[in-house]
Amino acid sequence: MPWRPPAHSVPGREGQFYAATFHAHAAFCGCGGFIEHLNSIHPRFLGAGGPPPPPPALRRALPAPEGPGGPPQHAPPNPPPEGDHQPPRRGGGAGGAGDGHAGDGDAAEEYGPEDLDLLFAAAAEDDMSFKAPSSRHQTRGPGRRAKKRLRFSPGSPRQPRLGGESRRSPSPRRTSTPKRKRGATPQAAPAAKTTPASPQTRTPSPVRRRTQTEEGSPHRPPPYIAPPPIVEDLLFPNTQKKKKFSKFDWETEAQLAACFDRPMRFFPSDLPTYPWLPKKPTTQTTFRVSFQLKAPQ
């Protein structure tokens, strides 16, 4: 039976290869670690592998199956162009009509010394086109007007700043020392004029403080009395249901019943009964009360 290519995809073939090697290892070794086993014995067989295997051959497509009309008819190749209008090869030169591999050795002789100027000009043109500024970075031309600065006309004169003169002085600022007239005696520099601080335009409002509440005033909040802490009544718990015996209580009750010769109780709140004690005699108490009231004289 001739060989046929596998019908599975690449992930399927990889999975089947891994499963085959895994089960092959499990057939003769029971360590359970296939990868660790290979890593442990790999250093011992580094030089025994031999030369590397040859690269896999290219797989060619299988011929198409024959249809009802016989084998498929392939179109004949295009005829070569007539005349000397054949496409030039990349190898260039006079031997362009020869074998296609003949121009590989003459790749260095493709351009002559007379073509260097054209190559440098083309490279410079490409460099200039690459460095040309784009449309978004174009400088502003003379015909384009700049944006005007927004200026607001104040409706009311500005108020002077507190604690000194205004920020901008009305007098122009000097940038150089004035020239001295000929024959004039130098005078002492006048003392710096200090401008007193401008008084406040309005009187400050008085600070309002909360009036102190009297000691016996009824407007004071009542004192807070915290509720007493809750203390559970351990001796007489206020529960509707009777407390049941635990395992330890049952054992203690059995020991007490055997010690005092009495029956066991079912609930801890029940009173114990002692049948061997003498019964209390039943007595009927009868008495007569007589009194006499005397009126005051």
UniProtKB/Swiss-Prot annotation:
Composition-biased stretches (Acidic residues): 106-117
Start-end of Basic residues biased regions: 137-151
Domain of life: Viruses
Compositional bias per record (Low complexity), positions renumbered to this chain: 184-201
Composition-biased stretches (Gly residues): 90-100
A Pfam family that the UniProt record links to this protein: TT_ORF2-like
UniProt xrefs under InterPro entries: HEV_TT_vir_Orf2/Gyrovir_Vp2_N
Chain spans, region Disordered: 46-229
Biased composition (Pro residues): 65-81, 219-229
Protein name per UniProt: Uncharacterized ORF2/4 protein
